[in-house]
A protein has these predicted regions:
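Extended, low-polarity segments enriched in aliphatic/aromatic residues
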Residues: 1-140
Length: 140
């Protein structure tokens, strides 16, 4: 898959899974949040996501994919804490403000619709999108 070759050329895989705490002044809901420490070690974050449906948010795209910065053990806590769609969406916006990616790439060549994000039906869309603003990409 090319990962071994990339590491041999000097690429560094995310290995620091320490949980860190951050603060965001002016946050809508997530003034304090937890994230994975490797973000602090990165020269840049590039967000790769697959366009698909999501039961709570309607879809998973660039902005929602940044929920991936939250450590796995904390994700269920955040789903419980921000359990209505508007608060969950505000938390996603806060995370994107606190730890912004430099580039977002959306794979919408074949999306998924239906009971997302883990089940559904493949749907040919035929798009590959990239940009600096995750919210703009999500609106396209």
């Amino acid at each position: 898959c090319g990962v071994t070759a990339a590491v041999e050329r000097g690429a560094v895989l995310n290995r620091n899974f320490e949980v860190k705490e951050g603060r965001l002044e002016g946050a809508a809901v997530a003034r304090e949040f937890k994230y994975t420490a490797y973000l602090d070690e990165a020269d840049a974050v590039i967000n790769f996501c697959k366009l698909k449906t999501h039961g709570m948010m309607g879809m998973t795209c660039a902005a929602k994919n940044m929920f991936g910065i939250v450590p796995g053990s904390v994700k269920s806590e955040y789903h419980y804490r921000y359990n209505n769609p508007m608060d969950f969406a505000r938390m996603i916006v806060d995370l994107n403000r606190a730890k912004p990616a430099r580039l977002h790439i959306v794979d919408a060549v074949v999306g998924m619709e239906g009971n997302g994000p883990t089940a559904g039906t493949p749907r040919p869309i035929g798009c590959l999108l990239a940009g600096k603003n995750p919210h703009t990409l999500d609106m396209i």
